[in-house]
Amino acid sequence: MEPKFHAFMFPWFAFGHMIPFLHLANKLAEKGHRVTFLLPKKAQKQLEHHNLFPDSIVFHPLTVPPVNGLPAGAETTSDIPISLDNLLSKALDLTRDQVEAAVRALRPDLIFFDFAQWIPDMAKEHMIKSVSYIIVSATTIAHTHVPGGKLGVRPPGYPSSKVMFRENDVHALATLSIFYKRLYHQITTGLKSCDVIALRTCKEVEGMFCDFISRQYHKKVLLTGPMFPEPDTSKPLEERWNHFLSGFAPKSVVFCSPGSQVILEKDQFQELCLGMELTGLPFLLAVKPPRGSSTVQEGLPEGFEERVKDRGVVWGGWVQQPLILAHPSIGCFVNHCGPGTIWESLVSDCQMVLIPFLSDQVLFTRLMTEEFEVSVEVPREKTGWFSKESLSNAIKSVMDKDSDIGKLVRSNHTKLKEILVSPGLLTGYVDHFVEGLQENLI
């Protein structure tokens, strides 16, 4: 019987990072290992329901130190605009003393981290191992975060001529550039210094990029598999959404969710709404209020609600995304190609239309649309603007069962989904991942 280990987990202060770390923690706990999960105090309540093994996974709350310019009480990226992520990153670095005190007191065998590049050096001082666990796509790391890499420039030996940035991606690169220098240093330093690199992906989707990363860093790369969240069967789909969706034919409704960190300018928000209207299809749009508006209703185009009242809803709050995707009426999922959302998309039966906003989302979108041809990307102008016509046309192209594009992406998506949900694939990844940890670290 293999020895059991005690792991620390210290993810970036974003729910899009903390939740995938917790999914991995659940898999480790399921195999009898212990996990101490370090996170901001306020985040604990929102994550507790994701902890399936509370006897084996213990939350260790941290006090987020004040940083000049960071709003008081801000602890996660959900509390701030993307432009302030750099300051939250500084706050994360200032928790080092708290993290080291926990290490001294609890003596873990290894530490999983992503942005805290100082973890490997600290771990070595205490004779424990470090794992750089990357939850963004391997394509992003391979393209942008290899030694000597530059934002937007394909590195020598990069294994794809399709999964890359183009002229019209300036908007995504500009958004990241505010945060990029610090982020690049954090991730590459962590990858260089850690004992093992772990990626949340599978070779069936990103194998050539994982191999490239391993060669670039001269390190063992372990894959966890996609780490789909456990379905929450304790709560059914909210009645308001079940009632609304059940009023339409199977596979006829478009569900659009641009991501929790995306706050659109009012004109782009309205164009998004008008694009959904222009499809002529029933839709549910879950989106944050536009910049300058306190509610989504304030930002809607004039006369919009009246025109779509029988077939469309714009909602500014949280929704049960996995349960909505599983509803038989949903036929198309329009999303930002975030690292968690895209895996949910791939194992659903919905057609996929992608509107990436950040650089990592752009690269994974290209992987989906051009390497695998399982989705369609909404065209943009250089400014990042997408028109109602471009959105509507993309949606209609995949929803039309008789169109060449619709047939192609539907067929390819079905094939890829069959691979990802094949019996034993995901459990096999977890088994091999744990074996790899024990062979290389414990």
From Swiss-Prot:
Q: Which InterPro entries match?
A: UDP-glycosyltransf_plant, UDP_glucos_trans
Q: Where does UDP-alpha-D-glucose bind?
A: 260, 319-321, 336-344, 358-361
Record's keyword annotation contains Cell membrane: no
Q: What class of enzyme is it?
A: transferase
Give one Pfam hit by family name: UDPGT
| TM annotation in the entry | none
Which key words tag this protein in UniProt? Glycosyltransferase, Transferase
**Assigned EC number:** 2.4.1.-
A GO MF annotation of the entry reads:
UDP-glucosyltransferase activity
The question of whether Flavoprotein is a record keyword is answered with: no
Q: Which domain of life is it from?
A: Eukaryota
* Family that this chain belongs to: Belongs to the UDP-glycosyltransferase family.
What is this protein identified as? UDP-glycosyltransferase 79B7
Q: What organism is this sequence from?
A: Arabidopsis thaliana (Mouse-ear cress)
User: What gene does this protein come from?
Assistant: UGT79B7
